[in-house]
Each structure stands twice: as structure tokens, then as C-alpha cells.
């Protein structure tokens, strides 16, 4: 599952402004999709990467579950054609990452790449 804690950390540390989400089409068969939004270790909740890596050795992911879209999206060519659940999923990931998700792929072919902000 998508680990929003680690992605947010990587985006901050590396000064990212945008992300790409690939293989969104692969999730189309799932009734629900989980996103790791925090970790729990020894009764403490971590919503950011802990200062000491050793915490991860015993940490358990805390997931938020979103509804899946359960349909084929491989023919979608722009963000607005995606099912509402897929758009909500991307928006949720973007909010957690703290940066834009500007590229989304819905298959292996070049024309299956959606540039969300290009007009």
C-alpha cells in the first residue's frame, strides 16, 4: 500500500514540487484501497518519519481505507474522466504528500499518461 508518511518525508527532504503516480489502473479491481497515514510503536503514534530509524523495526502501519472504483480506467485520457473515487484517492494522496501529483499513469503506453495540470 501507499506509504504517505515516507512519501511526505521524501518530498520535504528532497524539495519536491510534484509527484507522479504510476499504475493507477492496477488498483481498479479493488473494492477498497488502503493508505498508510501513520505508524504506531509502543503506544505512540507517528505521523512523520521518526527521528530514530529503530522505531520502524517495531512500528505497525495505521491505514486509512478509501473506496475503490472497481472499473477499468485504462482508456481515461484526462483527470476529469477518472471515476470520482479515483480522483478522491489522488487528491487524498496529494494532501498527505504536501506536493502536487501532476502525472498519473493508467497503463504502460505513452498515451496512457495523464498530465494533470497541462492544458
Name every feature range the model reports, one short phrase each.
Residues 1-119:
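Non-transmembrane, aqueous-exposed alpha-helical and coiled segments at domain scale
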Amino acid at each position: 500500500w501507499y506509504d504517505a508518511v515516507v512519501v511526505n518525508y521524501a518530498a520535504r527532504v528532497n524539495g519536491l514540487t510534484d509527484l507522479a503516480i504510476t499504475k493507477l489502473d492496477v488498483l481498479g479491481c479493488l473494492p477498497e484501497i488502503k493508505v498508510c497515514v501513520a505508524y504506531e510503536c509502543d503506544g505512540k503514534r507517528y505521523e512523520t518519519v521518526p527521528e530514530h530509524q529503530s522505531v520502524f523495526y517495531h512500528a505497525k502501519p495505521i491505514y486509512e481505507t478509501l473506496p475503490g472504483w472497481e472499473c477499468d480506467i485504462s482508456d481515461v485520457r484526462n483527470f476529469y474522466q477518472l471515476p470520482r473515487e479515483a480522483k478522491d484517492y489522488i487528491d487524498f494522496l496529494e494532501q498527505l504528500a504536501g506536493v502536487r501529483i501532476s502525472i498519473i499513469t493508467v497503463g504502460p503506453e505513452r498515451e496512457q499518461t495523464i498530465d494533470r495540470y497541462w492544458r
